[in-house]
């Protein structure tokens, strides 16, 4: 009895020690949260606010994230088979709210979809109201880019939804090849993918491309009431025009945003608006199109856009100086009829400099209070490439209550990394996703970071 009593005492003492440790850790996190400010990493997510995931002991890059109704995160990107860049697959991972992989999804939280013999890159993801996951991108033969739109739908458990397209996969072929960069849902459940279509492809030279949109019925079949058999393409000035983002307005109109170029101003921000049947809306901009130059023969490209409740469109991307020495985050805001909004930074556009070369914003988010979050990174040209975030006030000035002077830089280590996508949680926190190189094998992993935002 004395031995049993002694063991029970040791157990009770050990239990009290564990309980005390748990209380201390809880108090530590609580104090951290109480002292935290908007833009700080969220210590309740992953390790100190960061998560890295090796999907295949190869090169993995996360491109986009979507939030489920239950708070879980769906992250999509590409993974290379044995680091063979001609054999990329769609990769999807789902995370619990604390940043751990959700083992109820796919195999230990991960799904891989192969397109045999093709380089396949998913660019965007959206969650349907029924929990199904729609991923859009492209698949092509390496160095030819003679590929197609690929739209894949997964069941909530990560299996392919065989009621959609051909075994869960829809392939849309445009002339000369195409690629989807974004996807969105209409209120009626129809799916719109947007990207680029090659009109004339010249390897090693400047190609002729147009904005490309495709709309699908709920089962993945083309919507014949949209454009020409479910497809629309739009030319700006006969050169390289690419749509990177697509929005649906409450009135059913569709806005595509990206870049267009000509010999005079080189690449500019570009936007086009369509009626619900896919025809150009001539009440927007000039003949349904808008171009915005950030000065001289710059390389300016919009990568993401968001729609304000008042109908104004915010676009973000990058602007490169004429001599190529500096590339900054670039943001433009348009009125509902496609004119630069002069109440935003006096001329409708602004740039954000993080102090090093070659920064690009890849995602824009709108807070409920009207403030603007831009997320991105550098272009892999130095070991100083990090996740970059900035917050703007409604009129375009940096919000100095966010991070340091309105800007946040997050490093995962001394090697290259950057953010490609972001989303808000229901509590306002920001989740950014991208990639991070590792010392272990010099390849890259999915990288996630979560930030506090009181909005």
Which positions does each model-derived feature cover?
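Sec-dependent signal peptide hydrophobic core
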Residues: 12-23
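Extracytoplasmic mature domains of secreted or surface-exposed proteins
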Residues: 2-3, 17-18, 27-455
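N-terminal secretory signal peptides that target proteins for export/translocation
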Residues: 1-14
